[in-house]
Every structure is written in C-alpha cells, then in structure tokens.
C-alpha cells in the first residue's frame, strides 16, 4: 500500500487492474486503518479517473451478494450520494416513494447515515421497513408496493472493513 499511496500523493492514477485489486485487498482487511484512511482521503481531494471508477465498481460487483428479482421487473435505483454534509433531509428516499407512487418499480440501494444525520436505512427503519436480503421478500415488496430496499451492508459485507474509517473521516 505504501507504494500505491506514494504514487497517488504524486498525482498519479491507478489502472483499472490496480483499482480493482486494491479495493478487494481493502475489503479483505489487508491494510490497517491509517492506510485505508489515507487512501480514501486521496479521493476526497481529487476526482477518480474513469479507470479507477471502473475498477472499484467491478471489485464491488465481484464481492457483492447477488439476487435475482426476475425478468418481471424493470426497476430503477434512486441511490443518493451518501450525504451532502449539510444535514438536509434524505431526498433520494422520498424521491423513491414518489417514483414508486407514479407506477415505476424502484429498487432503492442505500445505507445508514455516515456523512449526514439520516441515511436511507435510517428513514426506512423508522418507518418500519424490514431490512433484508431475502430475495422472495424483496420480490414481494416490488410486486405489492412497487418498491424494495437493498440495505448496503447486507449486500456488500466486504465493505464492513471500511465502515468505521469512513465514519471517522
């Protein structure tokens, strides 16, 4: 990690392969919190390249728990940005209700608030929604209400290793 951090500190970018590999290594707890915090801080200071985003995305797709909601549903995800840092209300969750109410199928993806007071999971738990990764339950939610929720920790358990660092940052 030290070599990667040194390169990034010198304004270099990671290749697709490096990005994918390092995210998988971070998720397997290969690095300490200081190294992970340094790595994450770099991406708060500069925008990632297309190759970095693609590598991170593909690593997350490889590591995630997959479900099949069937071909009966074409859904849209109205995932928010993860907090605006201004403690405004959770717009993406409310938007999901509006879109589902208009007749579209919504598969919302989100988490508890990290950089704000109120993430999508906070809102939905408060409203009594059961957070689940049970495929049959999620299909029923879509079928009956036009809305189902994918609580990120249930679908991306590998990211638990960075949760406390993200919260601290």
Regions found by a protein language model. Give the residues of each.
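Structural motif
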Residues: 74-77, 104-107, 122, 146-153
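Short alpha-helix boundary/capping motifs
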Residues: 67, 71, 127, 151-153
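Phosphate/diphosphate-binding glycine-rich loops and adjacent basic-rich segments that engage nucleotide
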Residues: 137-169
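A generic, well-ordered mixed alpha/beta core segment in the N-terminal half of proteins
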Residues: 80, 84-140
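Short, structured segments at the rim of ligand-binding sites
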Residues: 25, 42-45, 117-127, 133-136, ...
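Acidic, glycine/proline-rich low-complexity segments that act as flexible tails and inter-domain linkers
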Residues: 1-88, 102, 106
